[in-house]
Regions:
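Membrane-helix boundary/interfacial segments in multi-pass membrane proteins
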Residues: 54-63, 123-127, 176, 226-242, ...
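Hydrophobic, aromatic-rich transmembrane alpha-helices
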Residues: 302-306, 369-396
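Membrane-interface alpha helices of multi-pass inner-membrane proteins
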Residues: 265-289
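Signature aromatic-anchored transmembrane alpha helix within multi-pass, membrane-resident enzymes
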Residues: 318-326, 444-478
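Active-site lumenal/periplasmic loops and adjacent helix-entry segments of GT-C-fold
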Residues: 108-245, 264, 484-492
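Extracytoplasmic
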Residues: 9, 15, 471-626
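Membrane-embedded, hydrophobic transmembrane alpha-helices
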Residues: 1-93
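Perimembrane helix-loop-helix junctions
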Residues: 294-322
Length: 626
């Protein structure tokens, strides 16, 4: 029941505020629903900012009141200043207008089913250290009554604002669900509704309101493996997934604005239309800055091509020069060192690996991957012929960057690929956005040749889509499931039994305690059950996040016999130690990094046993004098 309520709250938060604003501005149908999520997220982030400024609880009931007031205010302003932009291509009552909506509902159900089958339960933990700080940050926000994205860096070492976590905190507070259940509910809405609805809006903006085009876009959105399924298998990359899903509606608004500029649509109308892409891009960037870089890769070529084809050559030159400077400035930002190495393959792969990379972006099944790749290639060619070469550029550039990560030495490509962590999976997820447009171009071509009635084939399309959906369920669900239910014991970070044991031991800890626990043996999940500080918050080598942390990890058992260790313990403020638990396979690469914790036992001077539960033992560190 808590999951169903969280699902409803997440859907309402992601759509209702945005739809209210857009309807007030004169937008209807896909132009309201498809563009709603970026506007809604902007209002949710603003709600958190207001709560932060007022030092009040913005997560629970007060947050809903603030959101309602902000939505009403912005909707009122939109009603006063908006200049509706009519689409002359759309008839008053297009044939088959409900079919795209049905395709979105069906496709969303397929994606939600894949996720549900893979996860099994809304309280199942993804077995990767990312889940610790993503769900943990949401947990801490809820505990503090904060929905302010800027507070996230106080809880987790993430190099970007916490837009995802702020929204997840609001879903948690307003639904009453636990943070993990609320996060899964938010994830389900993002991949099964936000993503396909945004893609349909983008296809409509580029190719027009043809039902064949919109249905194809909706179906392609849930068939492509690179997004969302590959990202669901890769880890808890939920902020990146949401930011990438927001690219489609933001890009749609950018194209609409460019169209107005190209025909000199009037300053007031242009200024009103500019608000949506600016607000949407800002919201997506707060969720994950990679959205801004993705928008530059796909959107900038689209803007330049559209201006040039409209004869606005001088303006195109100005935009190109400004865009080049902005891109150079954005890519020259010095990122954290770990972003330069996070997902880099380091080179050494061959041509066959690159081919496999491209094909698996479409599907894991060889036959459907080959057919899909042919359709995408044909669509890219048709896009160029139709005056939308930027679709082909937006497809080729991310895949070329992903291929360069495989083929070239890491140091060569990281300068360009660091916004995506030099990770091929994130890069090919970006390529899915233009891929869907390319497939929609094929549908547009076929519909134009055969006519809408024969192109849709009322009986043939449902049968084909159902078959493809079944193939998706068969191929995607087991792969996603491996993230939640590893096949071998050494891939678990914390089994369900270990989670129960940690919850039991957490009750013995005083609030504000600082605990030294091996993250590779499940210890890091402890702070999700209690408001404590962990010396090693995520699954990394024992970095000196606190003074003497490395010394504590390696030689904690010598706290009474080694003055240096005593000083390190005193400086780091460690009050308790957690030992036991099964090791994750990733710990083997670190050698004896956490050996000092493992050696603590009943015969070790300086420690008092407090409790045991399951495979774990909780110890109090007796006071030592440096």
């Amino acid at each position: 029941m808590s999951y169903a309520l969280a699902l409803l709250v997440a859907a309402l938060l992601l759509f209702v505020p945005g739809v209210a604003v857009l309807w007030s501005g004169g937008r209807r149908g896909w132009r309201a629903w498809g563009a709603a999520p970026p506007v809604s997220i902007a209002l949710l982030l603003l709600t958190g900012a207001v709560g932060h400024a007022a030092a009040s609880d913005a997560v629970h009931g007060a947050g809903a009141v603030v959101l309602a007031v902000l939505t009403a205010a912005v909707a009122g302003a939109a009603r006063l200043i908006a200049r509706p932009v009519e689409d002359p291509r759309e008839p008053s009552r297009p044939r088959g207008r409900w079919w795209p909506a049905a395709a979105v509902v069906f496709g969303g159900a397929v994606v939600a089913t894949v996720l549900g089958r893979a996860v099994g339960s809304a309280t199942a933990w993804p077995q990767i250290h990312d889940s610790i700080f993503h769900v943990g940050a949401t947990t801490m926000l809820v505990r503090d009554g904060s929905a302010w994205a800027g507070d996230v860096t106080a809880y987790a070492r993430v190099p970007y604002p916490g837009g995802w976590h702020a929204v997840a905190a609001l879903v948690t507070g307003l639904s009453g669900a636990d943070p993990l259940t609320a996060s899964h509910a938010l994830l389900t809405v993002v991949v099964s509704v936000v993503w396909p609805v945004g893609v349909v809006l983008l296809a409509r903006t580029v190719w027009g309101p043809s039902p064949a085009v919109l249905i194809t876009a909706a179906v392609s959105a849930f068939l492509c493996y690179g997004l969302p399924y590959q990202l669901l298998t890769w880890g808890v990359v939920w902020p990146f997934l949401l930011a990438t899903a927001l690219l489609s509606p933001v890009l749609s608004q950018v194209l609409e604005l460019t169209g107005l500029v190209a025909v000199a649509g009037g300053r007031r109308r242009i200024a009103a239309a500019a608000a949506l892409p600016v607000v949407g891009a800002a919201a997506a960037t707060v969720v994950h800055p990679a959205a801004l870089y993705g928008l530059a890769v796909i959107g900038l070529p689209a803007v330049l091509e559209r201006l040039a084809r409209a004869g606005r050559h001088r303006l195109a030159v100005v935009v190109a020069a400004g865009g080049a400077l902005a891109v150079a400035a954005a890519w020259s930002v010095r990122p954290p060192e770990r972003l330069l190495v996070a997902g880099a393959a380091g080179g050494g792969y061959g041509a066959l690996d690159v081919v496999a990379l491209v094909l698996s972006t479409v599907s894991q099944h060889p036959l459907s991957a080959a057919v899909g790749a042919l359709a995408v290639t044909a669509g890219a060619v048709l896009s160029v012929r139709a005056g939308h070469a930027w679709v082909a550029v937006g497809l080729v550039v991310p895949l070329a960057l992903a291929a360069s990560v495989l083929v070239l030495p890491h140091g060569v490509v990281s300068v360009l690929t660091w916004p995506w962590y030099s990770d091929v999976n994130r890069l090919r997820a970006l390529a899915v956005v233009p891929s869907v447009l390319a497939v929609a171009a094929v549908a547009r071509y076929v519909a134009g040749r055969a006519g809408e009635a024969r192109a849709l084939v009322p009986w043939g399309v449902p049968v084909a889509v159902a078959g493809l959906a079944a193939l998706t369920l068969v191929t995607a669900a087991p792969v996603v499931s491996a993230l939640y239910h590893p096949g071998t014991a050494d891939r678990w970070w914390a089994t369900p039994a270990e989670q129960d044991a940690l919850a039991s031991l957490a009750d013995r800890l005083p609030r504000g305690a600082t605990v030294a626990a091996d993250p590779f043996r499940g210890g890091t999940f402890l702070f999700l059950h209690r408001d404590v500080t962990l010396l090693f918050p995520v699954g990394d080598p024992p970095l000196p996040s606190r003074p003497g942390a490395v010394e504590v990890a390696a030689r904690l058992d010598r706290v009474r016999s080694d003055p240096d260790v005593c000083r390190a313990v005193f400086a780091s403020g460690v009050t308790h130690v957690l030992t036991g638990g099964d090791a994750n396979a990733d710990e083997t690469a670190l050698g004896d990094a956490y050996a000092g914790l493992a050696r603590v036992g009943s015969g070790t001077p300086g420690f008092t046993e407090l409790a045991r539960s399951g495979p774990y033992t909780l110890w109090r560190v007796d006071r030592c004098t440096p």
